Structures are given as structure tokens and as C-alpha cells.
Amino acid sequence: MAQTDKPTCIPPELPKMLKEFAKAAIRAQPQDLIQWGADYFEALSRGETPPVRERSERVALCNWAELTPELLKILHSQVAGRLIIRAEELAQMWKVVNLPTDLFNSVMNVGRFTEEIEWLKFLALACSALGVTITKTLKIVCEVLSCDHNGGLPRIPFSTFQFLYTYIAEVDGEICASHVSRMLNYIEQEVIGPDGLITVNDFTQNPRVWLE
């Protein structure tokens, strides 16, 4: 008779593997997420590098629009300053600009969003599909959200940057909270001016700022 009380053994590395899979899925934007996932884990089991299709190859294989900062700016303008947006409404906006449904679903899954979505969090994860690294992701988010419309360096309120960096680092799971806190404290005390704004160069060109 088969034993039913045998404890299930969950490998300690599983949570990290699942996070890496979720991030890879956002970046790859596969047309068939299930098949892509099967190929991904099969490659891992053989000790091989998981499959990642180039963005140009993806665009050639489908009629979806390519995700760009410009399209994210359009979505941001349509959200019109709201902090919370309903998933159904955002899905419709996403569809109107012809972005891949699988990418929308991947962002929803990684962010664990339900019926009501915190727009800045969704935007940050969507930008991570373009940014790859945390620094590049935050650069793109700043460009999308920039309150400078006179052709200057993209800039956003430091409070917004603080929220986004903390969230992205938390989702990434590979950066300790103490490092995030240390970087934010340095930027706030040594970099931010009286206007309370942070520019892209403040965290991409400053050798003392390392967000990764």
C-alpha cells in the first residue's frame, strides 16, 4: 500500500528559480507561454541555458506591436494620474495599443495583481521587460514619468523614485533591503536638491550610486 504521509520536499532554490522564470518570461514575451515554460525548465534540467528569443525575432513572428517607452507613455497618459486602475480597463488599453496579451498576463502574474492594480507598480514591471537591470529599468520609468517637458534630463519626484526602487528591488529578490536603504539615504542627503527631484544622471552617472 502506498504511503500517503511522506513529507513533500521542496528544494530551497525553488523560490529563486520561479522568480528567475517569471522575469525571463516578461523579457521573452513568448507567444505560447506554456510551451516556452516547458522548454525553459527542460533546458534547466539538462544544465543548459534557458531559451530566450530576441525581440526582433518575436516581432517578425507575430502582428503584435513591440513594447516601447513611447507606448508606455501613451498608457500612462491614459491612466491620467490615477494611482489605482481596474485590471479590465487596463487590459483594454493594452489591447488598443496592440501589445502582446502574454506580456500583459506575465506582468499581472509577477506583480500578483488582481482586480485593482497599482499603476506605478504595473508600469515598473512592464519597464523591466525593456530594462533588464534595475538601473536601466528605473531609467526607462523616469523617462516615461518625467515631469520635464522642455527637453531637459528626465526627472521625477524623489518620493516616486524611492517607491519604485524599493518595489523593483523587492520583486527582484536579489538585493538586500539594507543596500536599498543605504542608496536611498545617500541620494536623498547628497544628491537631491531643494526641488525634491531626481534626474536620470543622478543614479546612472554618479559613481557612488550603485542600485544593483
UniProtKB/Swiss-Prot annotation:
Subcellular location: Cell projection, Cilium, Flagellum
Transmembrane segments: none
Residue ranges occupied by any RIIa domain in the UniProt entry: 12-49
Any one Gene Ontology cellular component term annotated for this protein: cytoplasm
Keywords: Cell projection, Cilium, Flagellum, Phosphoprotein, Ubl conjugation
A single MF term (Gene Ontology): signaling receptor complex adaptor activity
CDD domains: DD_ROP
Region Interaction with RHPN1, residue ranges: 209-212
PTM description: Sumoylated, sumoylation decreases upon spermatozoa capacitation conditions.
Residues that bear Phosphoserine: S56
Miscellaneous comment: 'Ropporin' comes from the Japanese word 'oppo' which means 'tail'.
Self-association and partners: Homodimer. Interacts with RHPN1. May interact with SPA17. Interacts with AKAP3. Interacts with FSCB; the interaction increases upon spermatozoa capacitation conditions.
Protein name per its UniProtKB record: Ropporin-1B
Lineage: Eukaryota, Metazoa, Chordata, Craniata, Vertebrata
Encoding gene, per UniProt annotation: ROPN1B
